[in-house]
Amino acid sequence: MKPERRRLGFWVGGGMLAGGLLPFLLYWLLMGDFSSVTVGQAKRLLEKTNSMAALVDVRSPEAAAANPVSGAVNWPASIVSSSNRPADMPPSLRGKTLILMDEDGLGSARIARMLRSGEGLEVFSLSGGMAAWDAGPSARHTPSRLRPMSIAQQCIAVATGFGVKPAHMVLCVLVILWLWRQRAPDLVALRWGLLIFWLGEVACAINFVVADETSEFWEYLHNYGNSVGFSFTTFAVLEGLDRRVIKYSAPKDRCAAIGLCRACIKYADVPCGLRRIFSLIIPATIVIAFMLLCAPIHFVSYNTGIFGSITTYSHLVGSQLYELRYCSLLPIALLVASWLVLLCRRRDPVTPAKILFAAATGPLAFGFVRLFVFSIYNDELVWANFWEEATEFLYVFSAAAVLWIFRDSLFVKPAPANGLASSVPA
């Protein structure tokens, strides 16, 4: 392997690893040291004979009344924050092991950390919050807590889980195998993008089968796989347009934009029109990224029946923090870096700027897709799931269609380009 390819592979792989681990680090810094229990562990503690454990609902009185939890004592977080001593607790909770729960498990974890600092307090946080509790057997088999779903919606749910999703996963594998021996940089990037996207979808399937879509870990792997997969695909599109259509990076080929520029940087000491347009697109994309950062977070979780089978629909707050906050802040940082490289680097600035731009576009596009479907269908998550899977099917199908339509030219090795763009690790 050439040194340039090894170096680029190191930076891309290192960036993916750092980008994947950063949310875990941020979560740890935010939540600090606390102990959490699963729904099963919490129920075992509560059901023990002479149990000294108590379930504490730290949501507001209004939220607790709207969606009550049997056996839970409502102790609102606003009051808990000023009552960190055993003597300040409600009498029914004194001397007991406390299991705190709220909508998402994040606020209860912070409160648990605060209460554990009080002498003699043993406090746990319910992992997953109400979303996990609603997925538990007691809530799932309480008819009054089941949201009705029409026959058409039940059919859509079945078609999504057993039709659309398996279809695009199988098609994705076929396209990956088709691209397996290709060495052109754009096709290699597309292959990696589809492979990482497929691994994310595998994590999604595991979350559905094993955890009933309540595992933040598997959902994070799903989200991260989609984001990185879209980034590689964006780079594949940019690289393919450059090398095969525009011919910007090929030093001996005539740039397709020369008719607009009249003079070309390849042949004269003039500013490059495409580079100047790129330097305007990047700041515009930064502005758009702030739309995600300003979007509100809405917790939603409910149980429903699908042809006699009880299932839980939820949009976890941890996932929304990734989609709306991380997928805006990280792209903003990458886009700023891309813009600075384009303005300040003298030798071949477009190639690294293009890589950084593609890295930013993936999570940004993923965040906007999630924002779009869950904003429209926030109260009917069956439709949100359907349109997300349908969009993913269109993504894979579009890649396959382009490869098939232009197969005679795409699978011919393109002319080498000048710069690292021709050195994408295979």
Residues covered by each model-derived region:
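Hydrophobic alpha-helical transmembrane segments of multi-pass membrane proteins
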Residues: 189-210, 358-374
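Hydrophobic transmembrane alpha-helical segments in integral membrane proteins
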Residues: 148-171, 320-332
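Juxtamembrane "helix-exit" motif on the non-cytosolic side of transmembrane helices
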Residues: 203-216, 293-314, 368-380
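Non-cytosolic membrane-interface motifs at loop->transmembrane helix junctions
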Residues: 213-226, 318, 379-392
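Rhodanese-like catalytic fold shared by cysteine-dependent sulfurtransferases
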Residues: 3-43, 53, 61-99, 103-148
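Membrane-interfacial loop-to-transmembrane alpha-helix junctions, especially the N-terminal start
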Residues: 182-197, 274-284, 348-362, 414-417
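Membrane-interfacial, low-structure loops and terminal tails that flank and connect transmembrane helices
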Residues: 2-4, 243-278, 412-426
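Alpha-helical transmembrane segments in multipass membrane proteins, preferentially the mid-helix core
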Residues: 172-180, 326-351, 404-406
